[in-house]
């Protein structure tokens, strides 16, 4: 018997190391590790996938947020542009009555913001009309806008109405009536357009059509002062001068519409002008119409601030001239005032040949021959191809020589001017003045003052 530990237990310990269940092979332990590794990989994959998904969602959200911000910015920009456009149109519309030149700038800016919109172009045309630049208004609508054919019927009608009004102010009543008629295609036209349409028809001699428009105005409820004005215009067209005179005077005394007062003033002056032409034949129904025209026009220039209205100044010049020659009661200064008014017309930039001839006639009659010759110098410089200034000059020189002693007379300058006038005379010219001069030259030839 021994006290050492027994060795038989070693085998059991070895088995326990390799197989807890009592088996001897190590392979089942490696399989479990692979399973655990695969599980860990799947967890990592799932985590990575979740991270990628979260990143994608974040990126999508950021992109959507940026798109929303961009859309909001674009919307704000569009809104700002619309607000700016609306403000420009409103400001321009208000300025049309007070400062149409500035209104043109507003409408140009509005056109730049929305070039496809018709409204700023129509408003620009209206501003030209308000600025009294009628020729420019007409060319803008007809040439630059092509009568608005690219726009809808309503826009075309508005442009036709403006065009009709511009032609009316240019005294082209046929064109005015034509475009006013076209403006009705877009529906009812404004009272102002009806007014000018009726007046245009009356001045064209179409009294029945003018009366029809007036009836439409009554039916539409047009104000009494406007219909009274149109009725007076129709009376004037019918040459019922007394009725026309009282009608225009009533409008001047009753209406508060300054624009209508100016129209009535001008038309009343035209009544007096036409009657002044009848005074010389003794057939004027109105006494001393030229003198009345002077009073109406001179007062109108002061009352309505018409110092820059060349047509009013021209009418006043003619009224002074006619009153001087037909009404013995007027001051002698009327003839000189006529000259001053014609000079005022020239100062305002109007260049018409008859203005120079009228002014020359006045200075000649006043025996202010130096001023008469200066007027002829300006006439010839402005119209170098016209024969009239040379014909007048020859007559003037003949007058000046006739005032001298016979021994001091020299008609050579008159003959030279006469020959120049003959060289410039064209077949389509009114040869009246040349024929008068020719008679004077022939008389001088007969008397031996000049060679035949």
Predicted regions span which residues?
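Register position in tetratricopeptide repeats
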Residues: 97, 130-131, 169, 203-204, ...
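Canonical tetratricopeptide repeat
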Residues: 123, 155-162, 196-199, 230, ...
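Alpha-helical segment of the N-proximal tetratricopeptide repeat
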Residues: 78-113, 277-282
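Start-of-helix register in tetratricopeptide repeats
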Residues: 86, 119, 154-158, 192, ...
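Terminal, low-structured helical/coil segments at or just beyond the last alpha-helical repeat
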Residues: 415-452
